[in-house]
């Protein structure tokens, strides 16, 4: 942040008040120091040239209302932007003591070390020189960025259209433990979809169709309802896909098989179809012994009521819902393609199937292995209409904010071009990264809405600085003055926002990395275009002012009324030297500031803040972690009711987890088996594990050997009988990995998890199972394909905390480097932490999860919190007012309107996302809305009040 030399403290004999002299006008009150005209029109010295002493004041130095132009050799002097709508940094228009304030550059030269005012001086001189060049050659600076945009825009040719966005790659942690566990399973265990399919033994998700059937009556365990379900099952299996040359893809061709038959979609339904006399009131749950073959029914029935013990479980008295699972071949590439074609055809025809069947007893919802991907990609279409609306609203806001009755100073066209400049930045930034090959993920579609708000803020700063220049000055000199004032401000805010964004690259989520890269690059282009093509357009508009001003010095009654209004509104000649103080700034000075600094107001503000921080902390402990898969689709998607039914009826049981022995062990050793059994018992004692559904080949094998009068403790006996055992128990064939040297390299068993419906429970389950495996004396590993997504629950909080801490530390360092007041830096850090706690806490109240999408917003939150708080704090500590209340009022007068307008413009930029039908876009709006509201509240209410309590220590 650019720094100006602190003004001398008023002594006892000199106590300037924050009151307006009777004879002073509004602009004069904040311009008490003498200002002078520059004499030369030569370009300022280069950016690295040493500053020179100021020239003697010119003949117009006595004019109180004239701003101080920059002369040939005059060093750039910082000045305040009274009504800049975003975070202007210079404060020279504040009331000054009568004694002369030394020049910052002069002080800097006499110091042994270069302080932050030297950095500000270098930046100011650099931009002063750039502004002169833009004013001298506006067409070059206007057309060159347009040509660059046209060239980089060709990168949109590489925008992926038909390529699927890999949800696992982009929305699960990079290098997560589950991915390493999956690689181990794939390297040590095989599966066979064509002959011996087992869903629980697969390391990856198979192609499948899942139908959830809900009965309109209390239970579907009656022959009439089963007959209707069977009719639905027959319609699905009869579905055919027509191919070229008259061939077809039938379900029987692509279905996963167990021996010669397609895997039944529901074991009990299949048993009833084979034997219609099956007594549906004598089924045990969760395991059912059918013809000496145990059938595990977890996940196949929901909304059930159980009775007394029966066989391998309890009597299933009633069941409200049933699941039909149709597994398809996945391993073979050719069959995989055919399976997906069949699934796509099913999705297209499923509504017609339901209409034809006219089901009366059941309701059906559907989901496939392709649904998540297809519906997620479809969400991008929902945001396209609101994208156009956002630009219309921003243009209207910008044009309205820049409207003046004085048509010479009117900047409506300039404001409209400023919005266009932000659009050019989006095209250039996205085009460049698409050329490079950075993946474009759907959540990057949120970025243009954010760029709109930020770009408009920077535009307002430059327009406000232009209004502070002298109409009679040369365009080059006016642009030089504008850049020396405004460009430093937008440079600092751009640096902080980009710095906060680029900390997100450290995230372990690819989606967060891609968003931060795209948004950071686009912010750079937005900044570059603001100081080039937008500045050039403003210079060209300045020439219009000059031409219009030169036309008339006095209004002639003979001229047409349109000509009068165009150049001289209401028939008056514009003030060439006047400054433009916005009425809202006067409101902050005359009404809001004095009201806020009253004692009773301060106590009320403290009370409100205590309530805010308590409720925020409470919310932080109740925020849900992880990305709910149903939120990847739009609200009207068919998968939303599917997940609702699944949550209501099928949440009692979780995934069936592999327990893998990862190294060679002596299974024939009784002590080894005892250690392994002890570990299994520890797993079964876990609150999230059903001890009655454990399945392990070793237990069955030991019983098999003992039943055949064999000694399981003798190595040769143990190893030589394994082939016979596997032929009698083929279910275990894929659970033992035996090498060519007849050694068991690895093996696995299974445990059944229960009651893990919430993200918090999934996180705890994963942590506890892995901890048990680590603590076991036998080398164990736990894995299920769902763990790939469960890992996000453990990683998201760690990632968020790390990114927030790193970004906050970076902001603290930046504030220390650019602000010569350590206490101010502490207040900035306090505000950042307070806003983050508030946003995180209120996410829980607004039902927003802490996931990779919201983590992006929390990172962005840091940059905006810095912008809102740093300038108010700096204006307070650098104020020369004698009392803390007057310091606070002055800070609000100078910067209250910019902070307010910055928040409003950003909210307008993202508010259209509230109408989006997709969670990922609404979440962006919700969190950015909270960031703007809480950030503005800290900048305009909390920080000004709290500073009055501690101002005496400054």
Swiss-Prot record:
Residues 1-103 are annotated as: Disordered. Residues 90-102 have a biased composition (Acidic residues). The keyword Membrane applies. May play a role in sperm development or sperm function. However, does not appear to have an essential role in spermatogenesis or male fertility. The chain crosses the membrane at residues 139-159, 297-317, 383-403, 423-443, 447-467, 486-506, 520-540, 603-623, 804-824, 826-846, 858-878, 894-914, 927-947. Its main location: membrane. Residues 42-57 have a biased composition (Pro residues). It is found in: Cell projection, Cilium, Flagellum membrane; Endoplasmic reticulum membrane. It comes from the Eukaryota. GO terms for cellular component: endoplasmic reticulum; endoplasmic reticulum membrane; membrane; plasma membrane; sperm midpiece. Residues 383-540 form the SSD domain. It is a multi-pass membrane protein. Residues 1-20 have a biased composition (Basic and acidic residues). Keywords: Cell membrane, Cell projection, Cilium, Endoplasmic reticulum, Flagellum, Glycoprotein, Membrane, Transmembrane, Transmembrane helix. Glycans are attached at residues 192, 275, 279, 678, 692, 737. The gene is PTCHD3. This is Patched domain-containing protein 3. Pfam families: Patched. Expressed in germ cells of the testis (at protein level). Detected in blood lymph, colon, small intestine, ovary, testis, prostate, thymus and spleen with highest levels in testis. Belongs to the patched family.
């Amino acid at each position: 942040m650019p720094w100006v030399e602190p003004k001398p403290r008023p002594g006892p004999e000199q106590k300037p008040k924050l009151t307006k002299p009777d004879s002073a006008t509004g602009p004069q009150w904040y311009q008490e120091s003498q200002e002078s005209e520059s004499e030369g029109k030569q370009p300022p010295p280069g950016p690295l040239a040493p500053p020179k002493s100021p020239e003697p004041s010119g003949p117009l130095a006595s004019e109180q209302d004239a701003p101080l132009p920059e002369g040939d050799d005059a060093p750039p002097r910082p000045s305040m932007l009274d009504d800049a709508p975003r975070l202007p940094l210079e404060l020279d228009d504040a009331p000054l003591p009568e004694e002369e304030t030394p020049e910052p550059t002069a002080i800097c030269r006499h110091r042994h070390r270069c302080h932050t005012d030297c950095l500000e001086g270098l930046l100011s001189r650099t931009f002063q020189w750039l502004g002169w060049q833009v004013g001298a050659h506006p067409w070059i600076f206007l057309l060159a960025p347009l040509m660059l945009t046209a060239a980089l825009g060709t990168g949109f040719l590489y925008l992926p259209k038909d390529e699927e966005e890999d949800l696992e790659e982009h929305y699960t942690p990079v290098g997560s433990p589950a991915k390493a566990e999956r690689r181990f399973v794939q390297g040590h265990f095989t599966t066979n979809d064509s002959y011996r399919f087992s869903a629980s033994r697969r390391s990856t998700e198979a192609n499948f169709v899942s139908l959830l059937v809900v009965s309109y009556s209390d239970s579907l365990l009656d022959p009439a309802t089963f007959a209707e379900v069977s009719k639905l099952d027959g319609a699905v299996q009869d579905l055919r896909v027509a191919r070229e040359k008259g061939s077809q893809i039938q379900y029987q061709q692509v279905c996963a098989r167990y021996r010669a038959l397609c895997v039944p979609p529901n074991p009990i339904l299949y048993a009833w179809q084979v034997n219609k006399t099956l007594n549906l009131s004598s089924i045990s749950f969760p395991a059912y012994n059918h013809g000496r073959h145990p059938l595990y029914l977890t996940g196949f029935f929901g909304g059930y009521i159980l009775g007394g013990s029966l066989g391998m479980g309890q009597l299933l008295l009633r069941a409200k819902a049933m699941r039909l699972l149709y597994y398809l071949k996945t391993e073979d590439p050719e069959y995989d393609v055919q399976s997906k074609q069949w699934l796509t055809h099913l999705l297209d025809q499923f509504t017609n199937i339901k209409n034809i069947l006219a089901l009366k007893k059941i309701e059906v919802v559907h989901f496939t292995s392709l649904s998540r991907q297809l519906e997620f990609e479809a969400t991008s279409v929902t945001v396209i209409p609101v994208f156009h609306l956002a630009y219309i609203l921003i243009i209207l806001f910008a044009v309205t904010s820049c409207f003046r009755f004085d048509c010479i100073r009117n900047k409506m066209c300039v404001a409209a071009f400023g919005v266009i400049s932000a659009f050019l930045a989006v095209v250039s930034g996205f085009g460049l990264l698409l050329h490079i090959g950075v993946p474009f993920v759907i959540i990057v579609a949120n970025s243009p809405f954010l760029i709109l708000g930020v770009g408009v803020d920077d535009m307002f700063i430059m327009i406000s600085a232009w209004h502070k220049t002298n109409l009679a000055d040369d365009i080059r000199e006016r642009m030089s003055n504008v850049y020396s004032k405004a460009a430093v401000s937008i440079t600092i805010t751009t640096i902080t926002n980009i710095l906060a964004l680029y900390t997100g690259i450290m995230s372990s989520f690819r989606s967060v990395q891609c968003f931060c890269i795209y948004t950071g690059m686009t912010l750079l282009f937005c900044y570059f275009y603001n100081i080039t093509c937008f500045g050039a357009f403003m210079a060209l508009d300045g020439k219009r002012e000059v031409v219009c001003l030169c036309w008339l010095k006095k209004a002639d009654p003979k001229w047409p009324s349109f000509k009068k209004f165009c150049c001289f509104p209401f028939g008056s000649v514009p003030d060439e030297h006047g400054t433009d103080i916005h009425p809202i700034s006067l409101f902050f000075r005359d009404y809001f500031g004095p009201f806020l600094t009253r004692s009773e107001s301060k106590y009320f503000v403290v009370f409100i803040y205590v309530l805010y921080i308590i409720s925020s902390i409470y919310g932080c402990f109740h925020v849900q972690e992880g990305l709910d898969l149903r939120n990847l689709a739009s609200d009207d998607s068919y998968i939303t009711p599917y997940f609702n039914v699944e949550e209501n009826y099928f949440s009692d049981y979780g995934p069936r987890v592999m327990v893998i022995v990862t190294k060679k062990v002596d299974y024939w050793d009784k002590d080894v088996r005892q250690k392994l059994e002890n570990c299994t018992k520890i797993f079964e004692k876990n609150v999230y594990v059903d001890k009655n559904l454990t399945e392990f080949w070793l237990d069955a094998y030991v019983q098999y050997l003992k039943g055949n009068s064999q000694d399981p403790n003798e190595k040769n006996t143990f190893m030589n009988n394994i082939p016979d055992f596997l032929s009698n128990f083929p279910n275990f064939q894929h659970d033992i990995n035996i090498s060519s040297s007849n050694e068991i390299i690895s093996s696995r068993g299974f445990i059944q998890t229960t009651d893990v419906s919430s993200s918090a429970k999934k996180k705890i389950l994963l942590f506890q199972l892995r901890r048990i495996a680590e603590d076991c004396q036998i080398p164990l590993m736990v894995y299920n394909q769902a763990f790939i997504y469960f890992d996000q629950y453990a990683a998201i909080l760690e990632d968020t905390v790390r990114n927030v801490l790193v970004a906050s530390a970076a902001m603290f360092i930046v504030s220390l480097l650019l602000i010569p007041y350590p206490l101010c830096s502490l207040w900035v850090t306090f505000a950042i932490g307070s806003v983050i706690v508030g946003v995180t806490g209120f996410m829980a109240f607004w039902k927003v999860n802490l996931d990779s999408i919201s983590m992006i917003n929390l990172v962005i939150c840091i940059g905006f919190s810095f912008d809102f708080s740093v300038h108010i704090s700096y204006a307070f500590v650098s104020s020369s007012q004698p009392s803390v209340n007057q310091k606070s009022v002055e800070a609000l007068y100078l910067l209250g309107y910019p902070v307010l307008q910055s928040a409003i413009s950003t909210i307008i930029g993202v508010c259209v996302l509230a109408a989006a039908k997709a969670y990922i876009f609404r979440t962006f709006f919700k969190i950015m809305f909270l960031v703007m509201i809480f950030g503005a509240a800290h900048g305009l209410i909390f920080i000004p009040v709290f500073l009055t309590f501690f101002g005496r220590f400054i």
